[in-house]
């Protein structure tokens, strides 16, 4: 029997209990992602931008630094939204505490829309239809993910913790045995089905994240499938023990970063 799935509404409130730990423990996005936004998606000075599910701002700060202004960040969790505001005291940034479905954004007003490791929490078809309405002709949409895991490489820590972590899945798991952010065929097909984009493209990179036992526990504490468990503390203690006793305090997680971009047709 496949694992149960966290409801979208529950998942959207799963990350705000400790925003500072989330911001510190989650890895940054590779530089090539933002380089692509600059070279392909016209990110630069004065790019009118919206960001879906901005969280604590792991991508927001980079967007602001590269010229996204004004930038409207949409974040449904008020705790994450407050952290985002306080960490980015930039007059170009506006934070809307709202689900994207309900966000008040002007149609045709944006040069760029972005979502970083958050788009799987939305209904893809409905969200893409709204995104297309918000972008001006020639505007760009970009969704990217840092995905934990890569089946093409050995992953001993994942195998060692599989029984401990059994439980609910979340939408990032995907529907076809492929993580949502890595299901190239499905994501590109959804973009094309809108009929709103004249260019769609994707790129990926693989890399490694090296963690000690404390950083391992801190990272897993940010996973919705861990943070919402009633036995969260014992699971984190178990992860810490495995990292220390079976891996000598050095855990290597396989990472894949994926990026999907699409240009709004005239």
Model-derived regions: residue spans:
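A short, conserved alpha-helix within the catalytic core of class I
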Residues: 122-131
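Conserved catalytic/acceptor-binding region of the Class I
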Residues: 132, 136-206
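Conserved class I S-adenosyl-L-methionine
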Residues: 1-44
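Conserved Class I S-adenosyl-L-methionine
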Residues: 56, 179-266
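Class I SAM-dependent methyltransferase SAM/SAH-binding core
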Residues: 50, 56-103
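A short acidic, Gly/Pro-enriched loop at the edge of an enzyme's catalytic core
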Residues: 103-113
């Amino acid at each position: 029997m496949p694992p149960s799935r966290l409801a979208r509404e529950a998942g959207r409130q799963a990350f705000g209990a400790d925003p500072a730990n989330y911001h510190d423990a989650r890895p940054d996005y590779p530089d090539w992602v933002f380089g692509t936004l600059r070279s392909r998606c016209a990110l630069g000075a004065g790019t009118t931008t919206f960001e879906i599910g901005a969280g604590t701002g792991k991508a927001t700060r980079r967007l602001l630094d590269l010229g996204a202004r004004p930038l409207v960040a949409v974040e449904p969790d008020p705790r994450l939204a407050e952290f985002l505001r306080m960490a980015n005291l930039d007059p170009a940034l506006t934070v809307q505490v709202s689900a994207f479905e309900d966000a008040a954004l002007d149609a045709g007003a944006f040069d760029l829309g972005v979502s970083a490791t958050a788009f799987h929490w939305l209904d893809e078809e409905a969200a893409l239809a709204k995104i297309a309405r918000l972008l001006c002709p020639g505007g760009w949409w970009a969704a990217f993910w840092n995905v934990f895991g890569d089946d093409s490489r050995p992953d001993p820590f994942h195998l060692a913790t599989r029984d401990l972590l059994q439980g609910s899945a979340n939408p990032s798991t995907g529907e076809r045995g492929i993580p949502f952010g890595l299901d190239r065929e499905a994501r590109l097909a959804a973009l094309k089905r809108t009929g709103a984009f004249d260019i769609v493209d994707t790129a990926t990179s693989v890399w490694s994240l090296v963690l000690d036992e404390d950083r391992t526990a801190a990272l897993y504490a940010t996973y919705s499938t861990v943070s919402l468990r009633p036995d969260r503390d014992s699971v984190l203690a178990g992860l810490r023990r495995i990292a220390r006793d079976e891996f000598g305090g050095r855990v290597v997680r396989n990472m894949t970063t994926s990026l999907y971009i699409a240009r709004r047709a005239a």
